[in-house]
């Protein structure tokens, strides 16, 4: 009996654990502190800094089953998902890694043992082929002489991409940095399937499938292209779980493995589909995996960056559900079956099931409102199409008006053998972005990552000033030996009391000084293992090796500590008041305010906000001790410590406890006791995305300042109303009631004036071929009264065509009314469009009533004068 996907995942991890590898949990799909990546898309992403020498772990061998998403940017599989056997938006990458430990020999032997041993995967050896880089004789000989693979099944692959080292079998992290040859293992499904071995003209067939890629990082590529050997070569491997499951379960398509069969059946059940071979079932089964895990990792549907990619995937799934005949929201119902089929790998998702389901349901409901209208418009455009390409402007209009991502439009078009002008779409998108940038006043801001080889020791938990030594200086991202007065720079010290921005807490400010210099620190950031002090040399000169006195701005740090500790109290209070589904989705802690984003599906009620505020202040009055302990990560989680969104933790972690009320993993700086916070006040609660709320709050002196400000405002209002704070509410209610009464009386007067004006106007109507035509510009009439006047005039005049206009604050308002018996010849929408075009505007409406606006008031008389001729031509 073949292994299940869950059993294959566990067997892989167990095998490498038996070979001395640390089993490391999958990292978040949102890469930590890596702006170069949209999503985690490979097992090595979480170890990137280790390979670059910027980070160290307490193990030199690791193994993972890493959740990955490829659905945006360079690595984008979205358009092929559902139409091929092996494309997915979400997949799991099994991997084993060596950080300067074993190299080619052991990496190859491990792979061969796992794949062929009867104890493990027991694949027939004669079905396995391998490729090596053309000049990698060492790997070739290991495969041939030690493993025993015949030469005819070992294929050398050269530089097949048009440049030196540009090869399927040479891996590079970037233009510079670690790189090296790789060896790939292929499985031969047999001659009943079309395709040829790798490197042959038929290599794109499905007979020979790559199942494992083993990368040997042995060189450091320099800027001039030269390759220098690394002092400690490393290994990075990747094997797609779904691919190896297909091989071990004797199927040719990933969608036929047990995991997908179960999900496809669940999709069929919730959509009512009966044909299990329908490609839409495969699309939805794939998409629920990426969408659910992305939301669980903190991504929310939006119109930008990661959130937009998520929205695209959700909407593509919803559209395929629509094709299957789904009559109601269905997508969120697949989260439960997904959790069941993922087994132990779905535990994180299970904890957030309710939140994930709610976000998916809300997004589907929102899109459902525009889906049918958008599809109808697309059908109309395709019906009019004379060629085989839909223009980019139409694709953009579908996106801008109906929320259709361009790949969804492309999906519909592909089903009809029509292409989409994606270049035209991108041009329209870029024009919209340009307008948005100009409107916002913001341009691009790029901050290149500084490469620092040295490390800094942080001593800021216990010290706010200490002596250190300059180990590196950077100006404009480049290392320098010295800086002079007036220069902006980054200063790295061997030890520092300055806290570098992390975990939502901003970096410290302060001063680095000596007898002959002063460096003003405006920010502090991490650069790998180093801490960079960012600022300007105010006086003197500074060079590498100089001794400095590092002084943190103590008052600012104190305010930050209070806000950070209050954030922990508020997090715990939110979970008590709203429920345990609340989890942190982001935070900002500075010296003025704390901002906290958290998962919750609706706006907080006033009484809930008050309850959270009261609960936090109760803990402040308890004056609980705030204690820290260093322990193993797993032990901390077992103790109930909450790990925060987006953070990357070492195996040894800092656990922060506030009595029995709050326990979290945190590396930030905090008060000594909760009583130090003094007072906590929530100043705003709002939504930032579907399923995400944001609270802003203040503490200590900042909270007291808001109390004083509120009191001052109340006193001012009481003075204006000639009352006091005791009867202020009654006074306000009285004023509001009087205001409502006056507004009602004013509206009645306006309606009476409009009725009188209508009566006066009716006598000015002229006869045009048996129809009364009335065209008039009115002064002193509110635009919203025009519609009432047109209705009155239509009742008075019978068969009639009316155009009224008014100008307010330089803007033209137009309305056209046509009696029902005339709409077969004159349509109000066409008439108003003709007039509006002449005054720099546009508009539309029903055949009997239409409205428009314009910006060119000077052109209004001529535009109104043109109505008679236009109407006469229509009535002939």
Curated annotation (Swiss-Prot):
The modification N6-acetyllysine is found at residue 74. Keywords: Acetylation, Aminoacyl-tRNA synthetase, ATP-binding, Cytoplasm, Ligase, Metal-binding, Nucleotide-binding, Protein biosynthesis, RNA-binding, tRNA-binding, Zinc. GO terms for molecular function: alanine-tRNA ligase activity; aminoacyl-tRNA deacylase activity; ATP binding; tRNA binding; zinc ion binding. GO terms for cellular component: cytosol. Zn(2+) binds at residues 564, 568, 666, 670. Its main location: cytoplasm. It comes from the Bacteria. PROSITE patterns: AA_TRNA_LIGASE_II_ALA (PS50860). Its EC number is 6.1.1.7. It is found in: Cytoplasm. InterPro entries: aa-tRNA-synth_II/BPL/LPL (IPR045864), Ala-tRNA-lgiase_IIc (IPR002318), Ala-tRNA-ligase_IIc_anticod-bd (IPR018162), Ala-tRNA-synth_IIc_core (IPR018165), Ala-tRNA-synth_IIc_N (IPR018164), Ala-tRNA_ligase (IPR050058), Ala_tRNA_ligase_euk/bac (IPR023033), DHHA1_dom (IPR003156). It catalyses: tRNA(Ala) + L-alanine + ATP = L-alanyl-tRNA(Ala) + AMP + diphosphate. Binds 1 zinc ion per subunit. NCBIfam families: alaS (TIGR00344). Consists of three domains; the N-terminal catalytic domain, the editing domain and the C-terminal C-Ala domain. The editing domain removes incorrectly charged amino acids, while the C-Ala domain, along with tRNA(Ala), serves as a bridge to cooperatively bring together the editing and aminoacylation centers thus stimulating deacylation of misacylated tRNAs. Belongs to the class-II aminoacyl-tRNA synthetase family. Catalyzes the attachment of alanine to tRNA(Ala) in a two-step reaction: alanine is first activated by ATP to form Ala-AMP and then transferred to the acceptor end of tRNA(Ala). Also edits incorrectly charged Ser-tRNA(Ala) and Gly-tRNA(Ala) via its editing domain. HAMAP family: Ala_tRNA_synth_B. This is Alanine--tRNA ligase. It comes from Shigella dysenteriae serotype 1 (strain Sd197). The gene is alaS.
């Amino acid at each position: 009996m073949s292994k299940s996907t869950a059993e294959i995942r566990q067997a892989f991890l167990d095998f490498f654990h038996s070979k001395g590898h640390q089993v490391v949990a999958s990292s978040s799909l949102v890469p930590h502190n890596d702006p170069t990546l949209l999503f985690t898309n490979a097992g090595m992403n979480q170890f990137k800094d280790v390979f670059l020498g910027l980070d160290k772990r307490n193990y030199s061998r690791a193994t993972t089953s890493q959740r990955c998403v490829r659905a945006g940017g360079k690595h984008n599989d979205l358009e092929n998902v559902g139409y091929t056997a092996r494309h997915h938006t979400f997949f799991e990458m099994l991997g084993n890694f060596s950080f300067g430990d074993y190299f080619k020999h052991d990496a190859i032997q491990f792979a061969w043992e796992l794949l062929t041993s009867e104890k493990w995967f027991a694949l027939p050896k004669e079905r396995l082929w391998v490729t090596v880089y053309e000049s990698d004789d060492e790997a070739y000989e290991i495969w041939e002489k030690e493993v025993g693979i015949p030469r005819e099944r070992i294929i050398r692959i050269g530089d097949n991409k048009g440049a030196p080292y540009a090869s399927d079998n040479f891996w590079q992290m970037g233009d510079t940095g670690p790189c090296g040859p790789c060896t790939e293992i292929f499985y031969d499904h047999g001659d009943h399937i079309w395709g040829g071995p790798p490197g042959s003209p038929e290599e794109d067939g499905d007979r020979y499938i790559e199942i494992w890629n083993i990368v040997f990082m042995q060189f450091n590529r320099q800027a001039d292209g030269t390759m220098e050997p690394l002092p400690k070569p490393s290994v990075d491997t990747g094997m797609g779980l779904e691919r190896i499951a297909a091989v071990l379960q004797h199927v040719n398509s990933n969608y036929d493995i047990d995991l997908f069969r179960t999900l496809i059946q669940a999709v069929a059940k919730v959509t009512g589909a009966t044909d299990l071979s329908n490609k839409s079932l495969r699309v939805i089964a794939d998409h629920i995996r990426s969408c659910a895990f992305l939301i669980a990792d903190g991504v929310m549907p939006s119109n930008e960056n990661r959130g937009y990619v998520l929205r695209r995937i959700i909407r593509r799934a919803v559209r395929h559900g629509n094709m299957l005949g789904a009559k109601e929201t269905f997508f969120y119902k697949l989260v439960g079956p997904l959790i069941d089929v993922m087994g132990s790998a779905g535990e994180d998702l299970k904890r957030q099931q309710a939140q994930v389901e709610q976000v998916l349901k809300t997004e589907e409901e929102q899109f459902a409102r525009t889906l049918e209208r958008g599809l109808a418009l697309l059908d109309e455009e395709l019906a009019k199409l004379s060629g085989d390409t839909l223009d980019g402007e139409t694709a953009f209009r579908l996106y801008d008006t109906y929320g259709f991502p361009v790949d969804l439009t492309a999906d519909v078009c592909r089903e009809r053998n029509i292409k989409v002008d994606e270049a035209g779409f991108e041009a329209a998108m870029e024009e919209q972005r340009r307008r948005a940038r100009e409107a916002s006043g913001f341009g691009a801001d790029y901050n290149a990552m500084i490469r620092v080889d040295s490390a800094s020791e942080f001593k800021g938990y216990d010290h706010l000033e200490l002596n250190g030594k300059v180990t590196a200086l950077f100006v404009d991202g480049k290392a320098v030996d010295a800086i002079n007065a007036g220069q902006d720079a980054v200063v790295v010290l061997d030890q520092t009391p300055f806290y570098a921005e992390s975990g939502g807490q901003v970096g410290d400010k302060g001063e680095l000084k000596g007898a002959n210099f002063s460096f003003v620190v405006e920010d502090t950031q991490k650069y790998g293992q180093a801490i960079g002090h960012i600022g300007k040399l105010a006086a003197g000169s500074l060079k590498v090796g100089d001794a400095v006195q590092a002084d943190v701005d103590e008052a600012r740090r104190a305010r930050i500590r209070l806000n950070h500790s209050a954030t922990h109290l508020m997090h715990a209070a939110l979970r008590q008041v709203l429920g345990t589904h609340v989890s942190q989705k982001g935070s900002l802690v500075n010296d003025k305010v704390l901002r906290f984003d958290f998962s919750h599906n609706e706006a907080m009620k006033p009484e809930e906000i008050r309850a959270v505020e009261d609960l936090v202040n109760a803990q402040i009055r308890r004056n609980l001790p705030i204690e820290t302990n260093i322990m193993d990560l797993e032990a901390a989680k077992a103790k109930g410590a909450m790990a925060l969104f987006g953070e990357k933790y070492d195996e040894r972690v800092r656990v922060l406890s506030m009595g029995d009320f709050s326990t979290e993993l945190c590396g930030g700086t905090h008060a000594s006791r909760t009583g130090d916070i003094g007072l906590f006040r929530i100043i705003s609660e709002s939504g930032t995305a579907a399923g995400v709320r944001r609270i802003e709050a203040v503490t200590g002196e900042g909270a007291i300042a808001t109390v004083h400000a509120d009191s001052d405002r109340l006193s001012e209002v009481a003075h204006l109303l000639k009352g006091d704070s005791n009867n202020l509410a009654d006074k306000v209610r009285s004023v509001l009631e009087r205001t409502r009464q006056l507004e009602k009386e004013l509206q009645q007067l306006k309606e009476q004036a409009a009725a009188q004006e209508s009566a006066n106007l009716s006598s000015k109507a002229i006869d045009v071929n048996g129809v009364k035509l009335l065209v008039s510009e009115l002064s002193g009439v509110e635009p919203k009264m025009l519609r009432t006047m047109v209705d009155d005039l239509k009742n008075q005049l019978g068969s009639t065509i009316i155009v009224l206009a008014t100008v307010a604050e330089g803007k033209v308002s137009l309305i056209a009314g046509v009696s029902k018996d005339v709409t077969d010849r004159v349509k109000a929408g066409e008439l108003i469009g003709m007039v509006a075009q002449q005054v720099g505007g546009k508009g539309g409406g029903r055949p009997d009533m239409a409205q428009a606006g314009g910006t060119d008031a000077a052109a209004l008389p001529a535009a109104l004068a043109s109505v008679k001729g236009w109407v006469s031509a229509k009535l002939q």
